[in-house]
């Protein structure tokens, strides 16, 4: 594992030293073998797109599909570039709006936490540069799911932690947040909440892109426990290699919001963002691999035991 990690790190770091314009040229070259030869998850992407946009004909679906793969190749080289990107360049290319409003709201409301809903939209890896925009007394964190490949898990942890934030493993989320609460540490924590939960973690379903979809509820559940500010990250790609993330408030008093309403609002906002530019969402993820019918069947079997 260590050898694999050091080899991968050395290769990625050397590639990151190339100027971004040259890396985008590499991205353009990557598109053909990724889409036409390797056909990386083509069936999954096509199935996800056709189910999400039943009103679009095949020609339009294929157009979105190809634009997604072009962006996916950009995402790869942009992520590699993070290994050597300077703070100045990072702040020029990944701009955050609304951080000052979050910080002032934390002071005004006497809150230690702000939880931010995120999706796999645009380059979510660049969101890890948020600490560059925060005052020293406000810590940043992100909840992540460890990768099965230990070498690449270590590689991505190094990549995400280099900006001064903290990666919190999903299973350690509540414990770590309680530790920070006891220490009275102010913290902005990002929750990527558009993945498919495991069967035993499904508690709520949303209407998302024309399908009943199981969703994570941890953001609002833990947010209510620690009385966090709840925000949503509205991310846009302004042009190639440039992004803007605007933090928009959902509530400053989560305990007063009915259960699942915050999750539903996030899901709706994410859907609207995807509809505006569908090529920037991660369509290669098996988002709808768990159906409500199968979930109900499993629930009924559990009740019989």
Q: Where does each model-flagged region fall?
A:
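A conditional alpha-helix N-cap/helix-loop micro-motif detector
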Residues: 92-99, 149, 170-171, 212-213, ...
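Catalytic core of membrane glycerolipid acyltransferases/transacylases, capturing the structured
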Residues: 110-171, 198-207
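A broad structural signal for alpha-helix termini and local helix breaks/kinks
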Residues: 18, 37, 52-54, 135, ...
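General small-molecule cofactor/ligand-binding pocket signal
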Residues: 97, 166-168, 248
């Amino acid at each position: 594992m260590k050898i694999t990690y050091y080899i991968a790190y050395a290769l990625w770091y050397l590639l990151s030293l190339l100027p971004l314009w040259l890396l985008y040229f590499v991205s353009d070259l990557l598109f053909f073998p990724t889409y036409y030869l390797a056909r990386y998850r083509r069936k999954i992407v096509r199935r996800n797109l056709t189910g999400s946009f039943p009103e679009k004909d095949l020609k339009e679906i294929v157009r979105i599909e190809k634009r997604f793969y072009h962006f996916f190749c950009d995402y790869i080289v942009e992520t590699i570039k993070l290994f050597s990107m300077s703070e100045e360049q990072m702040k020029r290319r990944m701009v955050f709006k609304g951080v000052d409003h979050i910080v002032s709201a934390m002071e005004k409301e006497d809150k230690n936490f702000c939880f931010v809903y995120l999706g796999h939209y645009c380059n979510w890896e660049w969101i890890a540069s948020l600490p560059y925009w925060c005052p020293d007394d406000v810590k940043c964190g992100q909840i992540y799911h460890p990768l099965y490949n230990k070498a690449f898990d270590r590689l991505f942890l190094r990549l995400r932690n280099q900006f001064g934030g903290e990666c919190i493993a999903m299973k350690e989320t509540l414990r770590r947040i309680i530790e920070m609460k006891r220490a009275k540490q102010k913290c902005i924590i990002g929750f990527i909440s558009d993945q498919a939960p495991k069967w035993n973690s499904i508690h709520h379903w949303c209407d998302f892109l024309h399908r009943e979809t199981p969703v994570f509820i941890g953001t609002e559940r833990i947010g209510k426990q620690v009385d966090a500010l709840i925000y949503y990250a509205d991310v846009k790609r302004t042009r190639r290699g440039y992004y803007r993330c605007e933090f928009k408030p959902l509530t400053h008093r989560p305990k007063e919001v009915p259960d699942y309403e915050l999750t539903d609002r996030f899901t709706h906002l994410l859907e609207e963002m995807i509809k505006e530019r569908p090529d920037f969402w991660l369509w290669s993820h098996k988002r709808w691999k768990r159906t409500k019918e199968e979930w109900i069947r499993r629930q009924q079997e559990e009740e019989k035991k």
